[in-house]
């Protein structure tokens, strides 16, 4: 059952948006519309930038509802991975963020493939500066490995986020916020070297480009050359980022930027297998079961721009556009369980392009109603993903000995002999959204929002086109300030996800609907330098495709499986987190997540069973850094830990299991002088052997990194 406050929140959704007819005005005086007054003196501040703050928390974030709210003011479980924390823990790409972010699980499928999970569901939405990007099964292979050199911080909102992200699962949204130019000179060079011949260099420079400082620019470049604890594995990465900001007037700023990331890697696509019923085959962590000619290369180019105007009355308009061209080229191998035991290896070659285009226009600011000040945001967005994959596979299956495999023995197959494969589709989503934060009296804040979406899927390589028209996604939240430190809150959020399965009549099933109910308490200490929260959540995803137990003759005659939108899963649990400054010299972040997920309506053998066995029931993550005092004031020390309960994956008639484990990291840094800083990170101190991706009978098993060391030296202007 949903939490007790369901009915009251559902009733609140009926409230209209009478304030939605307001428009921003540049007039220095207030705009009066009867009882409504837009006050020029009301300003919503956004102090979300974390670079240079030295903090593990942030003052504001807008991912949840499009308004710059503090963590305490947001009626959902939200977190941030700041620039300081990225640097302290030596995070280099998005996988590192996911590994350490509260409540999120990183699942690997080899060195080049990954999946993110939260509250039992797959995360299929990323944002870049607030613009959503789709993450489908194969786009994860092309765009998810974002290098962090160009980002200021990553915001995390757990639960359904349909108001701002549109279609997706009720899991979480990650918002990667880019670095911006500074008006003062800023230059840094960081070089790192570590275990398995891993090397990395970053250069970051920013300054004003004219005397007045109205034109500013920033460039970032990074190069990484990684070997691996896995035999044959290596990767080279090149990252470039450039951005300029121009103040067209005192009120208007135009931003234009571009980035390029190139990854060239030796691929272990198939990765490591389990036995036919999940048995542990006790393979070493260095085992490589692909070939020395295998590769997985990726190229991502992004262009973005936005025009922001700040009106005298405190309102802000923003028009943002982004386009990403992502390519993935792979030629690699995968395993299959052989009849009678053992394994065979087959190969595949695929060229994938994924072009995503995003446009968003919004207007937000304060207004007065019945003598009280409130905030409103209005917007419209359009995003399109054009996906093309061409390639093929080879039917030939070569028997291999997984314990004595030589990557140089099996020759590279001839392209002419492959069985061709092609997948081409275009998904387009358009929407309008609105959210208002009402402040009826001082301790109480009510957020009401809604999104209206149109979704179209065009299968350009076959049949199965479909549309979703006027899908309504509501949002409701209540925050009550107990005192200057603590607030309690409750929220109801939704999200929808289209699906491709068809019913008996041949019609595409209606979208899945995800609902999230959440109640919690948040605390804000030391003027926002430290944030803490505890939340209970209860989520369902309904209308899931459910294969009919008895397939009608009409379905059998057309060689297709028919479904009904009858499946349902439920996820309940707890989120607890504290992050920020405990003292001026002590930064810390600690988070615990409890997830209980199960099938409610599904096949007989699934009903009541665990829905997400590959996400742990208990998950604990913590990181801390302390600056010593006195004669040791140039020294800082830190530690981090990731601990989780058991997980498993269904394999044959059994399970492949991962027992509970904990991974500990240590850090020490030394400030040599005002320009030079040294740091060393010792990861997996106890050399814990664990699966970061649980194996199946055909592969996918990926070990977490063994104990390793990384030295870093940074020069700052």
Where are these regions (language model features)?
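Structural signature of Gram-negative outer-membrane beta-barrels, strongest in the C-terminal barrel
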Residues: 245-249, 354, 373-377, 381-385, ...
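Outer-membrane beta-barrel translocator/receptor signature
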Residues: 134-135, 150-152, 163-240, 248-252, ...
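Membrane-embedded beta-barrel scaffold of Gram-negative outer-membrane proteins
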Residues: 306-312, 316-322, 326-332, 513-581, ...
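Surface-exposed extracellular loop regions of Gram-negative outer-membrane beta-barrel proteins
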Residues: 262-277, 384-389, 478-523, 528-564, ...
